[in-house]
Amino acid sequence: MPTNQLEQLKQFTTVVADSSDFDSMKSYQPRDATTNPSLILKAAGMPDYGHLVEKAITDAGSGASPAAVIDLLLVLFGAEILKIVPGRVSTEVDARLSFDRVGSMEKARTLIALYEKQGVPRERILIKLASTWEGIRAAEKLQQEGINCNMTLLFSFPQAVAAAKAKVKLISPFVGRILDWYKKSTGQDYAPADDPGVNSVREIYTYYKRFGYETEVMGASFRNKDEILELAGCDLLTIAPKLLGELAASTDPVERKLEPEAARKAKVKRVSFDEKSFRWALNEDQMATEKLSDGIRSFAADVRKLEQLIQQQRG
């Protein structure tokens, strides 16, 4: 019988580590792991992972661009993570390609080729792409090539609908960043059940199950343990080590909140978006527009910092 909340949660939700810290993964035994440029940058600056930076620089060769070294570094981190977790790792495409469909596809193929060179099959990789119109179109084509994608920076229902229609493998609707925006915008605090980020994932999960979409829903970006518990039953939840620790430290009961059978009976209408209506709906959602652009800028800035780190290490 599971004792702590983490073990209880694992009974009906796949737990994923939102981290590049190998030690925390060994402690909490998630099935999958997610990385992003910010997490890789943080890890790359730590002594424990310096050898991976050195290996990426050496193996890429003196003539390689900083971008090529970073590609290899992401893959080396991912390959190490896959020695710990039994499932999949998510590796992110350079955020500066968020509005470049062709460039995103080329980068994804490069990352997959590098993984396969490390002996990692593509079935264990999810390529993360920003949930822009261009990112979703890139993912649609990549899925047809057998490259599984994880749509990140997803803050709105239209983004989720477009991703499902494109038959992407998985989406990562953000929870905490939505809460951040609403708290700042309204000055209010929200009870866990009324958390706007939680409500967003609940709506998406219900829609997907109601209409039989196979795209997996992985709630992401949590600010507190209560947000996680309100989404117990979601397909997957990617959780930072601090919150994994809080769940593991509590023995309070965990109640399943999201049920596929209940969702299939929900009275919701099927909707569809072409490019024009997608862009308009996203633009009409101030929160989603601001958080998407903020997220892209932030990840792009961390990629640039990684490039600077590579240049410094090269001397």
Curated annotation (Swiss-Prot):
SUPFAM superfamilies given in the database record: Aldolase (SSF51569)
Keyword Cytoplasm: yes
Main location: cytoplasm
Function: Transaldolase is important for the balance of metabolites in the pentose-phosphate pathway.
Reaction(s) catalysed by this chain's protein: D-sedoheptulose 7-phosphate + D-glyceraldehyde 3-phosphate = D-erythrose 4-phosphate + beta-D-fructose 6-phosphate
UniProt record, GO biological process: carbohydrate metabolic process; pentose-phosphate shunt
Compartments it resides in: Cytoplasm
Enzyme class: transferase
Record text on subunit structure and interactions: Homodimer.
Pathway per the UniProt entry: Carbohydrate degradation; pentose phosphate pathway; D-glyceraldehyde 3-phosphate and beta-D-fructose 6-phosphate from D-ribose 5-phosphate and D-xylulose 5-phosphate (non-oxidative stage): step 2/3
NCBIfam families noted in UniProt: PRK12346.1, talAB
Species whose genome carries this gene: Opitutus terrae (strain DSM 11246 / JCM 15787 / PB90-1)
Its EC number(s): 2.2.1.2
One Gene Ontology term, aspect cellular component: cytoplasm
Name used for this protein in its record: Transaldolase
Record keywords: Cytoplasm, Pentose shunt, Schiff base, Transferase
Single GO MF annotation: transaldolase activity
